[in-house]
Regions:
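Alpha-helical transmembrane segments and their immediate juxtamembrane cytosolic regions
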Residues: 1-158
Length: 158
């Protein structure tokens, strides 16, 4: 993936987000969980460990690998260019806000179990969660970069 193009990174991120949705419709997302205590009952079995790491753990590979691909894309951007930084900031804030607003609307339109598909909760990490989370993360990173470039000699601790 180090040599992947920006388009391939974004395609991979989007693909992983929707692959997770397909997995949720195919397999039991709650298998192995005691949701009343948020403990994973069969974690120390081979099947439970694989399921937890790949699919239904706190930070499963699918779809969390999408965040890595998006981070790789961000790392390739010319963040020294103030216009690029500001464009990335405003797009990321807009994307996060739109994802959250869309989620609120769709969850109200489709209440109950079907509304979970449109949620932005971390468990299960549905596509709108990935979009909102990535937008928020990029915005925070960009704000930190902006402060760093604006105040290069500032220190947090004396």
């Amino acid at each position: 993936m180090l040599t992947a193009s920006d388009r391939q990174l974004w395609s991979g991120a989007i693909g992983l987000s929707f692959a997770f949705l397909l997995l949720v419709f195919t397999f039991d997302y709650e298998k192995g969980w005691d949701l009343s205590t948020l403990t994973y009952v069969d974690f120390w079995t081979m099947a439970g460990m694989v399921r937890h790491i790949i699919f239904n753990g706190f930070h499963p590979v699918i779809p969390w690998l999408a965040f890595i691909f998006i981070g790789m894309w961000l790392g390739r951007q010319d963040v020294k260019d103030i216009q690029m930084r500001r464009r990335i900031l405003w797009v990321s804030v807009s994307v996060a806000a739109i994802a959250e607003i869309l989620s609120i609307i769709l969850v109200k339109v489709y209440p109950g179990e079907s509304g979970v598909i449109f949620g932005t909760e971390p468990m299960p990490p549905m596509p709108l969660y990935i979009v909102a989370g990535a937008g928020t993360a990029i915005a925070i990173i960009t704000i930190c970069l902006e402060l760093t470039f604006r105040y290069p000699k500032a220190r947090i601790f004396p």
